[in-house]
Amino acid sequence: MWQETKRELKEQKIEAAVRIFAPLGVPAELMQVRVTNKSDMDMCVRVTSAIPIYGRSADNLRDHRHVTSLLHRIRTTGRGVICKPVLSFDERGHQKNHMIYFEMGSQGDGTKPESFFPTVESFIGETGTFLAPDALKNKGKGCPAGCTVDGKEAMGAMAFPEITLAAGAHVDYILLGGMTEDPKLAEQAAEMFCTTKQADAAFEQAKNYWNGLVNISFETGNPKEDSYLKWICFQPVLRRIYGCSFLPYHDYGRGGRGWRDLWQDCLSLLILDPKEVRSMILNSFAGVRFDGTNATIIGDKPGEFVADRNNITRVWMDHAYWPFVTTKLYLNQTGDLDILDQKVAYFKAVSYTHLRAHE
């Protein structure tokens, strides 16, 4: 999966095109940036990239944010910024942290950044913002490779050498951000994707992989609807990998799939890969209680369910609808009536004390 966007500043006559994707086999996201001179004369360009490095649990976005930033240990390398907090913050018992967060960069020909702004403070300054940082307004030079900073909010900002861009010419930049427990991987990955040629090859590999996961196309006469239907078929793949609410500022859940998602994934797979759907339907029915309610936390294994969030049993008006409509479509598509004779145990992890209290 990938996305591309372009932005042109007509008054300045410069265009930036950005392509973002995840290279296969590397726990990172790669961003290719192409800056094009749209004018009819030479232009001096000095590019500074800036991506914040949050570097800890989503829980700390609002809770103990400052305290957890004090745990950051930040250093700059030849190609980027690396942050490894000393502890994983947990009031029940703090643990030694092994996760490393990084942001690396290079020019399309492999040229390394000239200097770095490894902390939010050094980049935005006292009066600036992320959109108007003091480091750019004041033409700050940053720090070189090999510097270290402790106890600050980390920032993957790096300044590249100033270049003269001829009329109509372009220059490429490659940015790589990720996380790993391997202390060598960040710098190794930076060398793997430090040129446009390497990044383009990784993109083609990733594109072929994702295109192969959706093995169906639509021709309704409406190209927009065709693309939308293909996107719908692709969503269950993303949900299996990332969950539903995987962003730290999302306000619902912790990223796992929910009851509706199980059945909606089955509906999609009826089109993409029908042979898997029978077992998925049977496994999903294992989350139904004998009173018609259902478990609300989905386990890691097929057919595994956990009792309700916060130990509160709830009833949603549409939850019973999804097993019905999914099974009905499966029967109509396959004619597999034998599935109705299969035995599946009810979900039992519940206390009915609250029900007896009203008797």
Across the structure, where does each feature detected by a protein language model lie?
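Hydrophobic or amphipathic alpha-helical targeting/insertion segments
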Residues: R34-V35, R46, Y54, A320-W322, ...
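Aromatic/His-enriched, Gly/Pro-containing loop or helix-boundary segments
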Residues: I20, D291-A320, T326
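Short Pro-Gly-centered flexible turn/kink motifs
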Residues: M43, I163-E181
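Extended, loop-rich substrate-binding clefts of extracytoplasmic carbohydrate-active enzymes
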Residues: M1-A28, A132-M158, K230
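Low-complexity, Ser/Thr/Pro/Gly-enriched N-terminal "stalk/linker" regions
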Residues: F203-G253, S279, N283
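Polysaccharide-binding surfaces and accessory modules of carbohydrate-active proteins
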Residues: A22-G25, E29-K139, A189-N215
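Alpha-helical support elements that line or immediately flank enzyme active sites
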Residues: D261-G287, Y330
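Conserved small/polar residues in nucleotide/adenosyl-binding loops
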Residues: T353-E359
